[in-house]
């Protein structure tokens, strides 16, 4: 059994809009036919949307039991790439779900299953999550999205580990590889903006400057996109902070003012003297 990608994601999201009475009907359908994939997918979406961030409850337990079914029967289900652990955490099914993923990744499996398992392990064991995505990249080296995910995971671990510079450097390398392979211009610009931030954080100012210049150049043809406008805001902010790092206050003000124009309220909330100075300069 292998669900269609579009149907699975669409049906999962359609579960967000279910009423309690509609949910009851679908639960009856699943009780009569455990292989009612569409009904079960919609139910998983319903419980994830409504109870994913709640504390333990009967409804959350029911939702987690549907997730367990998918891990046991359709571990390549697309919605398992989402942060489903929000629904399964602290439920009776969670240990069984973890055991199922452990068994799956210990045997030969696809890059899709490795990615889904990595999403589950991310909050529990982020280093294991990284290992799984690294394995997925080796299996599917042309998949640009896996490289983006790997970069995000390195950055996630960098925020939690003492050896921050090592993981930031790895995140930069993975993101560079992703940008090289990504063909969608808007996604590429967003990734370049992130690369500029990471390069500056790892004190690689030449790469940060190069990334800012490339991102701003590519963005000229895509100014109508909100996503691109957000990326330009990030690029101009990073550009301003680079100038501050170099002690060039006048150019920093110009860049930060340009960033401010892209958003009604610029966000310079990160810790550090440069961010504090950036806020002071724009008062």
Residue ranges and their predicted role:
Residues 12-25, 56-65, 87-99, 122-130, ...:
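Helix-turn-helix repeat elements of alpha-solenoid scaffolds
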Residues 26-38, 67-86, 99-112, 138-146, ...:
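Flexible helix-coil transition and linker loops at the boundaries of alpha-helical arrays
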